[in-house]
């Protein structure tokens, strides 16, 4: 009897205590910050990581073959300077108060920037369509604006790198003086030209279905507009009719404005205000091109169909 009573007492002692709050681990604030509530978007308005990844992908693509994409264009542009200065005479002829080599060098620098920005922008989506890898651009969680920014940013980067390479090469050429008079003009017109051709390149890559289409735009639109934009001459030497046509060419304002940054003089107009008007006009033109490219990209024309 005593043993049974003792066992009953022990059972009563080991019974769980009820009514007391169970111990719980305190919530971790870091976990709450890492995992948002259900239904709340994980990414913000801009997918910064995705945008940066796309940009670096495009930069690494042309940097892997930098001899072809950066240094070869720099050498080709340098050959223009050598050939034209030898043909025209290095020290006998002056334009805008400087020798011919100093006059033509800034135009060649920004021309190289624009042409290579176009080459990079016109290849990305077209290469994806031809090689069957266009899905790599369309499937990631990137908006149309982010896709456009990544492509244009990489194209501008290539243009700037080519411009720096050409600048260094031409600075070493005898008779060339590339002293900066208006740094803001060099930066603004250089970037506006690179952005303009990058946007045109993206539009071309959307429209083109094969590399022949891309080459046609390069040979029949970009190259003529570049070479007939006052790179090797001032438009004041042209007949009034052709001067009016040249002033309708946006490449003319890029090249003459960029040259103004080095020489302090330009054939855009007789005053610095004319250069400012050209700078604002390029800004408006690029804004219109950016909106147009975005709208075409958003429709998925020739990309998703």
Task: Give, region by region, the residue ranges found by the protein language model.
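Extreme N-terminal basic, low-complexity initiation segments
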Residues: 2-7
